[in-house]
Amino acid sequence: MVTTNEPNIYETGVLDSNAEGNFVYTTLDAAINWIRKNSLWPMPMGLSCCAIEFMAVACSRYDLSRFGSEVTRFSPRQADVMIVAGTVTYKMALAVRRIWDQMPEPKWCIAMGACASTGGMFRSYSVLQGVDKILPVDVYISGCPPRPEAILEALLTLRKKLDTQQPARTFFKKEEPREANAPVPVNTEMPLE
């Protein structure tokens, strides 16, 4: 039998019968999802007039920091939510995709406004008809430009979506990457319509 000079925690009274209620039990997935949804760091990709509405959301009247998104980053390496706000042209599409590729995993995308979602009123040869042609979009915000309340609703929708993910199980299973995260080629040539 091995003896040590260390006291037994049960004999010293450090852990008693009342200690059971003082612990929080959770799964690893729930803990990771809670951390992710309460610390979303957006990166606004302001391409036109919708970017002004995003500035209004960050002000004190709407208080984006209530949702853990007060740290607006303009560096893709420090952000995990890209908010594409405005018209995406074919020339700008390659730059948007490069910035998306520089963001670390996990990352999410919000298409803000009618122009980012569907091309909006600009149905022409030079405008990409929806940013979902080059990026996997998680949440769409309608409107031209959308109201600040709609942007807050999109963040809440993204937070609900994060509750359903299983990051620890995906990590330990070593699954293949999802099709939505696969690289999407960008056609930089003008369409022949």
Curated annotation (Swiss-Prot):
<dbReference type="GO" id="GO:0008137">
    <property type="term" value="F:NADH dehydrogenase (ubiquinone) activity"/>
</dbReference>
<feature type="binding site">
    <location>
        <position position="115"/>
    </location>
    <ligand>
        <name>[4Fe-4S] cluster</name>
    </ligand>
</feature>
<feature type="binding site">
    <location>
        <position position="49"/>
    </location>
    <ligand>
        <name>[4Fe-4S] cluster</name>
    </ligand>
</feature>
<keyword id="KW-0004">4Fe-4S</keyword>
<feature type="binding site">
    <location>
        <position position="50"/>
    </location>
    <ligand>
        <name>[4Fe-4S] cluster</name>
    </ligand>
</feature>
<comment type="similarity">
    <text>Belongs to the complex I 20 kDa subunit family.</text>
</comment>
<keyword id="KW-0411">Iron-sulfur</keyword>
<feature type="region of interest" description="Disordered">
    <location>
        <begin position="172"/>
        <end position="193"/>
    </location>
</feature>
<dbReference type="GO" id="GO:0009060">
    <property type="term" value="P:aerobic respiration"/>
</dbReference>
<comment type="subunit">
    <text>NDH-1 is composed of 14 different subunits. Subunits NuoB, C, D, E, F, and G constitute the peripheral sector of the complex.</text>
</comment>
<keyword id="KW-0479">Metal-binding</keyword>
<keyword id="KW-0520">NAD</keyword>
<comment type="function">
    <text>NDH-1 shuttles electrons from NADH, via FMN and iron-sulfur (Fe-S) centers, to quinones in the respiratory chain. The immediate electron acceptor for the enzyme in this species is believed to be ubiquinone. Couples the redox reaction to proton translocation (for every two electrons transferred, four hydrogen ions are translocated across the cytoplasmic membrane), and thus conserves the redox energy in a proton gradient.</text>
</comment>
<dbReference type="GO" id="GO:0050136">
    <property type="term" value="F:NADH:ubiquinone reductase (non-electrogenic) activity"/>
</dbReference>
<dbReference type="GO" id="GO:0015990">
    <property type="term" value="P:electron transport coupled proton transport"/>
</dbReference>
<dbReference type="GO" id="GO:0051539">
    <property type="term" value="F:4 iron, 4 sulfur cluster binding"/>
</dbReference>
<dbReference type="GO" id="GO:0045271">
    <property type="term" value="C:respiratory chain complex I"/>
</dbReference>
<dbReference type="GO" id="GO:0005506">
    <property type="term" value="F:iron ion binding"/>
</dbReference>
<keyword id="KW-0408">Iron</keyword>
<keyword id="KW-0874">Quinone</keyword>
<dbReference type="GO" id="GO:0005886">
    <property type="term" value="C:plasma membrane"/>
</dbReference>
<keyword id="KW-0813">Transport</keyword>
<keyword id="KW-0830">Ubiquinone</keyword>
<dbReference type="InterPro" id="IPR006138">
    <property type="entry name" value="NADH_UQ_OxRdtase_20Kd_su"/>
</dbReference>
<keyword id="KW-1003">Cell membrane</keyword>
<keyword id="KW-0997">Cell inner membrane</keyword>
<keyword id="KW-0472">Membrane</keyword>
<protein>
    <recommendedName>
        <fullName>NADH-quinone oxidoreductase subunit B</fullName>
        <ecNumber>7.1.1.-</ecNumber>
    </recommendedName>
</protein>
<dbReference type="GO" id="GO:0048038">
    <property type="term" value="F:quinone binding"/>
</dbReference>
<keyword id="KW-1278">Translocase</keyword>
<feature type="binding site">
    <location>
        <position position="144"/>
    </location>
    <ligand>
        <name>[4Fe-4S] cluster</name>
    </ligand>
</feature>
<dbReference type="Pfam" id="PF01058">
    <property type="entry name" value="Oxidored_q6"/>
</dbReference>
<dbReference type="InterPro" id="IPR006137">
    <property type="entry name" value="NADH_UbQ_OxRdtase-like_20kDa"/>
</dbReference>
